């Protein structure tokens, strides 16, 4: 980090923070000096967080066995604890929050930033509502890191992200409708009948950051292939740019690899990141979820 004072102060590297809902490999956070806040979850009477989280395979195995976890949002005090040591050193902080359409974490962190700036007007904190989830939020974070490495200031980085956030596209499918029913996304009748006749829903995250069912198809392979068709309909001016594509999954890596292969075959894109969906989003989407994230003209 450059020294404070004069022109150098405005160009010093800033801290990027986010939520564990970005579903990036933890090694990425460490390598790129990113702090993340953990949305805790409770399963079988035990609350899990950053220090004691379950391995993904165990988490999903318990869900398949009937365990029904619940999640909580980041609170303002947690955000302050993460930011304060850096702010006291004179660093600027850019927080990229989990979609406000899916969690109250954005409002909690926005409140925390306002309270800290009231106490210390010299603190520079910017909170951006990503309107993204899972590796869509992860892609949002990666873009911020890319801009920071290119020498952009915190303000410039935040402005770019605000302008382009709706170009971060999310499409996905689930294998078990009952988890969507639990979250209020589909009716009980739809879940029961859909399961009986092997119906798989296709969903996306809309311009308000909400999770919205779009269509349904019969059969798992068709639902996975439909994700790439949905991508094709959204690429627009991004077609041919071969931007990175991210894929997250609820403990079904072979299905994620199948989607990755379809993307490679159709677009020649080789820069594809695959990672497991963390417990916070996995609680609501369930095992067997596959999500595809990419840059496009519209969500």
Would you name each region that the model predicts?
Residues 15-78:
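N-terminal glycine-rich anion-binding loop in soluble enzyme alpha/beta folds
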Residues 62, 90-95, 118-128, 274:
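Glycine/charged-rich beta-loop-alpha catalytic/anionic-binding loops adjacent to active sites
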Residues 12-15, 21-35, 40, 105, ...:
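Mixed-charge interfacial surface used for oligomerization/domain docking
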Residues 15, 80, 84, 121-124, ...:
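Generic alpha-helical hydrophobic packing signal
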Residues 65-102, 107-111, 158:
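Glycine-rich phosphate- or other oxyanion-binding loops that anchor nucleotides, phosphorylated ligands
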Residues 1-10:
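Short, Lys/Arg-enriched N-terminal segments with co-localized hydrophobic residues
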């Amino acid at each position: 980090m450059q020294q404070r004072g004069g022109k150098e102060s405005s160009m010093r590297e800033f801290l990027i923070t986010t939520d564990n809902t970005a579903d990036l490999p933890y090694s990425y956070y460490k390598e790129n000096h990113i702090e993340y806040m953990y949305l805790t979850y409770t399963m079988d009477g035990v609350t899990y967080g950053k220090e004691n989280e379950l391995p993904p395979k165990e988490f999903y195995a318990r869900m398949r066995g009937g365990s029904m976890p619940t999640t909580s949002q980041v609170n303002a005090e947690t955000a302050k604890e993460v930011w304060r040591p850096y702010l006291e050193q004179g660093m600027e902080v850019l927080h990229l929050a989990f979609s406000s359409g899916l969690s109250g974490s954005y409002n909690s962190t926005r409140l925390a930033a306002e309270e800290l700036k009231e106490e210390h007007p010299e603190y520079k904190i910017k909170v951006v509502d990503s309107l993204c989830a899972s590796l869509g939020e992860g892609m949002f974070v990666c873009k911020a890191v890319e801009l920071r490495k290119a020498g952009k200031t915190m303000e410039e980085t935040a402005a770019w992200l605000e302008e382009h956030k709706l170009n971060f596209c999310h499409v996905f499918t689930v294998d078990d409708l009952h988890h969507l029913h639990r979250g209020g996304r589909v009716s009980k009748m739809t879940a029961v009948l859909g399961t009986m006749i092997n119906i798989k829903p296709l969903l996306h995250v809309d311009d308000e950051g909400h999770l919205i069912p779009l269509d349904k198809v019969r059969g798992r392979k068709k639902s996975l292939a439909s994700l790439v068709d949905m991508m094709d309909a959204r690429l627009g001016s991004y077609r041919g740019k071969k931007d990175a594509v991210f894929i997250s999954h609820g403990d079904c890596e072979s299905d994620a690899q199948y989607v990755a292969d379809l993307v490679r075959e159709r677009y020649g894109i080789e820069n594809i990141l695959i990672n497991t969906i963390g417990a916070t989003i996995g609680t609501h989407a369930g095992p067997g979820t596959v999500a595809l994230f990419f840059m496009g003209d519209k969500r």
